[in-house]
């Protein structure tokens, strides 16, 4: 018996430094992760520090729109 919108939604996290480097064509790709967040606990955009295989280091991954 779901009421309206679900509380937990699927979000896509994208590497912020790869996005900046992609404009200059320095990066071979853009790292993306798929995760879930609780809409009530975190109404703002999610930012997590995750490993980027293209930058070879841990970077900030921010939530993007679908």
Curated annotation (Swiss-Prot):
GO biological process, any: translation
GO molecular function per UniProt: structural constituent of ribosome
InterPro entries cross-referenced by the UniProt entry: Ribosomal_bL33, Ribosomal_bL33_CS, Ribosomal_bL33_sf, Ribosomal_zn-bd
Record-linked Pfam families: Ribosomal_L33 (PF00471)
Cell compartment(s), UniProt: Plastid, Chloroplast
Keywords, alphabetical: Chloroplast, Plastid, Ribonucleoprotein, Ribosomal protein
Major location category of this protein: plastid
GO cellular component: chloroplast; ribonucleoprotein complex; ribosome
Matching PANTHER family: 50S RIBOSOMAL PROTEIN L33, CHLOROPLASTIC, LARGE RIBOSOMAL SUBUNIT PROTEIN BL33C
HAMAP family: Ribosomal_bL33 (MF_00294)
Family as reported in the entry's similarity comment: Belongs to the bacterial ribosomal protein bL33 family.
Protein name per its UniProtKB record: Large ribosomal subunit protein bL33c
Protein species of origin: Nandina domestica (Heavenly bamboo)
Gene: rpl33
């Amino acid at each position: 018996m779901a009421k309206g919108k679900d509380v937990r939604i699927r979000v896509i996290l994208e590497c912020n430094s790869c996005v900046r480097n992609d404009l200059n064509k320095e990066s071979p790709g853009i790292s993306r992760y798929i995760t879930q967040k609780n809409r009530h606990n975190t109404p703002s955009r999610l930012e997590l520090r995750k490993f980027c295989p293209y930058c070879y280091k841990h970077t900030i991954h921010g939530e993007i729109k679908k």
